[in-house]
């Protein structure tokens, strides 16, 4: 990976800085980003995707991300380090190079990534996916 990209990804974002400064245990999620039903948080596709075919971001570090689901597909790529996630009640540890693909409505919780951990999120609207091809990729260990 190009060194300037790596440096940029490891830079501490404003959100990460707030997580550290305020000793946050849970990442702050904008109220516009989700709908709440009972105690469940559903991340809105419009907040991230905004009519895009894919949305890519670095997952915020230094605080847990609360349990949530969404109506789009999410792929996590562990670029560096490791992170523990609870996915539909199952605990999984992602290590450098691991990819996790989650279907819509999958409930997952991300434990706080540390300074050496880089988790990349890719989000896709469901209508952009060829499900026949996806079925050949998915295995019994997929979420």
Regions found by a protein language model. Give the residues of each.
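Conserved short histidine dyad/triad with adjacent acidic residue
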Residues: 38-43, 50-70, 107
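Conserved hydrophobic "DFG−1" position in protein kinase catalytic cores
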Residues: 56-58, 77, 112
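Short, flexible loop/turn elements at secondary-structure junctions
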Residues: 75-79, 98, 106, 114, ...
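Histidine-centered metal-chelating micro-motifs
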Residues: 82-84, 100, 104-110, 128-130
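Short acidic-glycine-tyrosine-enriched beta hairpin
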Residues: 89-104, 118
């Amino acid at each position: 990976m190009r060194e300037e990209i790596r440096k940029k990804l490891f830079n501490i974002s404003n959100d990460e800085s707030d997580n550290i400064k305020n000793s946050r245990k849970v990442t702050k999620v904008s109220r516009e980003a989700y709908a709440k039903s009972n105690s469940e948080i559903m991340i809105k596709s419009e907040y991230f995707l905004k009519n895009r075919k894919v949305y890519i971001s670095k997952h915020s570090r230094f605080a847990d991300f609360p349990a949530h689901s969404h109506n789009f597909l999410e792929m996590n790529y562990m670029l560096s380090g490791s992170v523990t996630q609870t996915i539909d009640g199952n605990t999984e540890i992602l290590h450098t190079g691991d990819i996790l693909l989650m279907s819509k409505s999958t409930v997952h919780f991300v434990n706080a990534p540390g300074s050496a951990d880089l988790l990349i999120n890719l989000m896709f609207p469901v209508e952009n996916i060829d499900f026949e091809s996806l079925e050949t990729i998915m295995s019994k260990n997929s979420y």
